Amino acid sequence: MPEQQDRFLPLFASHVFQLYVDYDTDALLQDKRWIFSANQDMKRPDENYRILEKYPILRDVFLDKFNKLAKEFYALDHEFMISTSWLTITEPGEGGQSQHHFHKNSFFSGVYYYDDYEEDAGEIEFMTPLEYHSDFYLEPVDYNLNNSSSWRLSPQKNMLVLFPSYLKHKVNEHKGTKPRYSLAMNFIPVGEYGTSDSTVNTGWYSGDTDKEDPLLQGFRKI
């Protein structure tokens, strides 16, 4: 008879990864192409939403970090790329924060902190995606990872935070005396994934497809 032991199963958890980058990224401190935190949802095209294309070595460092957890933690044998990426600035005081939001058209998202931060720099706060699945409001005597409806992380230099893009998050009020800088990014799968009628191949949309079927050459407009 197998040994019987009580277990805790963190089923269907939304994992947030707190990683550190062993790479000199001080060049980002000289880049002034910021998007203000409060304006990230502005509906306008901006080449600065692909800022990591200006830093291909750094882009690959972040991508390697994500690929490692995708393969080792989630057992995903897929290719990924960084789609959008942008520098953010959050000013001190009133208005120095962003509203809760999440990222569409993205699988995972990330934030990298490349500056030295004050103790009261605005934290990144994550909200539970299960908010509307609970009918009771019961307040615990001590909050922890198992009972919290939100969780905060304070920025640290060289810290990379990766999380599912569906997680609502925000920058809390920045109470420091100097601007708070970060680099945000989104990850998407590329290549072929899915199955049957839910199959997607991103090559279909880039012109990387087979030649026209000769059977179709006889079709003509009626």
Where are these regions (language model features)?
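Non-heme Fe(II)/2-oxoglutarate
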Residues: 1-78, 97, 123, 199-212, ...
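Short edge beta-strand segments in beta-sheet-rich domains
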Residues: 14, 82, 121, 178-182
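A short glycine-rich, His/Asp/Glu-containing loop-to-beta-strand
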Residues: 81-89
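Catalytic core of non-heme Fe(II) oxygenases with the double-stranded beta-helix
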Residues: 89-162, 189-201
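Catalytic core of Fe(II)/2-oxoglutarate
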Residues: 143-222
